[in-house]
């Protein structure tokens, strides 16, 4: 095979990423519980589908390939974009099918299938969470880029729309707009077995609002005299009402938001864009009022950046997370890209820093393609170093603290392929829940049984399976004591477990 100078440079960069991960491995904490998320962005076909005109079968094949590669890299949660521009990548009676799915807004996939239902099923097969990602306000990303369907909200309710150049958004100050968004969330939570609802950073637009909503303010200002405070209140009301709505329908469904990483510069000594003053979002209010389950700030800058230093923002966010989960957003598609001009070790350095900050509960990578396409060896580094062992998602005891019962009748036997484990499903726990997953550990005979040690976890499987075959062939690596525990939907682990010993 012929290698150019560029080929060698790319290979060498990947090699450096591997070596750096190896060196740092001894310095990192192996955690039994952490959120390892990846965004699957559908707008502009960033991650999926690769083209707007694919057949349904090709779309499914691509999605399965993405999930398989994310799973192999150790990812345990997927943030799947289902609403990009007041459209739907699911079967909605409220909004039109997405242009990014079929090449024509309002046209369903042919042959028909429901992408959200499909990705939920496939994610759960792999013991991965599936969070439905919605852009709450964005209606048109780029005006006139494609024809809008007749039932698009801009055609149905033109009075709800604010325009900023080529961008159109739903007006957050109009009460009917919030009702409309809540109805969409309600529809998704009621009809789909999702694990979470996720909002990103798009509230009021990055193009600063001037007087576009001044008339709305006059009509709906209530007791507010300051339009900036009124705008923030509009966003806060939406976040609060979404949280209450989700809990009224299914309290096991999580709600998280990934805001822009800087609220105000005064907090972490930064000199960047302030989302509190432009996007009018107030994450500290959401955390204080406990109207979200997790916060995932987009810390898309480098450690040591002169104006927006990751190294300053991370500890600040960890200090304000309170009792909610903190998952750090990484721009892996940029800083792991082979053409990235910064340090090749940047992403590894960020992960190491996260492990050193105890209040960080996990990470979310934007976007999936950086892992699927193994940018700079990222997927390999995850698989063999950072995420070498499966991880459970962090518990949310404010939502559910009742553990499931342990599996029963665990038996083991040697077969040609390895060691076969078989067990039975337990009764329901006192909250009525059955196991959603099973966790399998393996210990050597001379080892202490420590279920807090994630290096002893060999697999995490969906509860539809009650048979598992350990196919690891190297007897020196494989122990002979197997333990199986149960996990419920919110990752509470059974207090008891089943144990079996196989003769060497």
Residue positions per predicted region:
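Substrate-binding cleft of secreted/luminal carbohydrate-active enzymes
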Residues: 283-284, 288-306, 322-399
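Aromatic- and acidic-residue-enriched segments that line the glycan-binding/catalytic groove
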Residues: 88-103, 138-165, 201-222, 268-274
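Active-site neighborhood of glycoside hydrolase catalytic domains
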Residues: 176-323
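Solvent-exposed loop/turn segments flanking beta-strands in beta-repeat/beta-sandwich domains
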Residues: 426-454, 479
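Beta-strand-rich modules
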Residues: 470-494
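Active-site-adjacent "subsite" loops/lids of carbohydrate-active enzymes
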Residues: 41-61, 132, 137-191
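Catalytic domains of carbohydrate-active enzymes, especially glycoside hydrolases
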Residues: 61-87, 191-195
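Pro/Thr/Ser/Gly-rich low-complexity, intrinsically disordered linker/stalk tracts
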Residues: 377-432, 491-504
């Amino acid at each position: 095979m012929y290698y150019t100078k560029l080929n060698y440079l790319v290979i060498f960069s990947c090699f450096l990423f591997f070596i750096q991960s190896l060196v740092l491995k001894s310095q990192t904490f192996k955690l039994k519980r952490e959120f390892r998320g990846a965004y699957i962005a559908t707008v502009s076909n960033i991650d999926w589908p690769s083209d707007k005109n694919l057949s349904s079968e090709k779309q499914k094949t691509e999605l399965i390939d993405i999930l398989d590669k994310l799973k192999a890299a150790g990812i345990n949660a997927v943030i799947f974009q289902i609403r990009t521009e007041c459209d739907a990548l699911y079967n909605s009676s409220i909004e039109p099918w997405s242009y990014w799915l079929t090449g024509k807004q309002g046209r369903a996939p042919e042959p028909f299938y429901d992408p959200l239902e499909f990705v939920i099923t496939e994610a759960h097969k792999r013991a991965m969470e599936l969070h439905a990602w919605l852009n709450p306000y964005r209606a048109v990303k780029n005006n006139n880029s494609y024809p809008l369907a007749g039932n698009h909200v801009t055609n149905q309710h033109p009075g709800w729309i604010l325009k900023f150049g080529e961008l159109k958004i739903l007006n957050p100050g109009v009460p009917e707009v919030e009702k409309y968004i809540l109805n969409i969330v309600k529809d998704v939570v009621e009809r789909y077995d999702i694990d979470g609802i996720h909002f990103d950073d798009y509230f009021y637009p990055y193009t600063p609002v001037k007087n576009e909503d001044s008339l709305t303010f006059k009509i709906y200002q209530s007791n507010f005299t300051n339009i900036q405070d009124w705008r923030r209140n509009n966003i806060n009301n939406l976040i609060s009402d979404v949280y209450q709505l989700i809990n009224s329908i299914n309290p096991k469904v999580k709600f998280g938001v990934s805001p822009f990483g800087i609220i105000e510069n005064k907090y972490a000594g930064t000199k960047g864009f302030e989302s509190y003053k432009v996007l009018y979002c107030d994450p500290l209010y959401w955390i204080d009022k406990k109207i979200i389950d997790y916060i995932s700030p987009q810390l898309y800058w480098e450690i040591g950046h002169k104006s927006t230093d990751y190294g300053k923002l991370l500890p600040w966010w960890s200090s304000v997370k309170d009792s909610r989960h903190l998952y750090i957003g990484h721009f892996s598609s940029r800083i792991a890209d082979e053409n990235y001009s910064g340090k090749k070790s940047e992403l590894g350095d960020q992960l190491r820093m996260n492990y050193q900050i105890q209040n960080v509960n996990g990470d979310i990578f934007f976007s999936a393609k950086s892992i699927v396409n193994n940018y700079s060896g990222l997927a390999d580094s995850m698989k063999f170093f950072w995420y070498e062992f499966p991880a459970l998602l962090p518990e949310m005891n404010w939502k559910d603290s009742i553990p499931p019962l342990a599996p029963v009748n665990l038996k083991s036997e040697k077969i040609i392929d390895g060691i076969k484990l078989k067990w039975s499903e337990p009764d329901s726990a006192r909250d009525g829940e059955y196991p959603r997953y099973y966790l399998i550990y393996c210990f050597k005979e001379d080892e202490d049984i420590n279920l807090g040690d994630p290096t002893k976890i060999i697999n995490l499987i969906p509860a539809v399976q009650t048979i598992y075959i350990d196919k690891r062939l190297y007897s020196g690596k494989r122990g002979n004591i197997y333990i199986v525990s149960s996990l419920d939907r919110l990752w509470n682990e059974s207090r008891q477990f089943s144990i079996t010993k196989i003769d060497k």
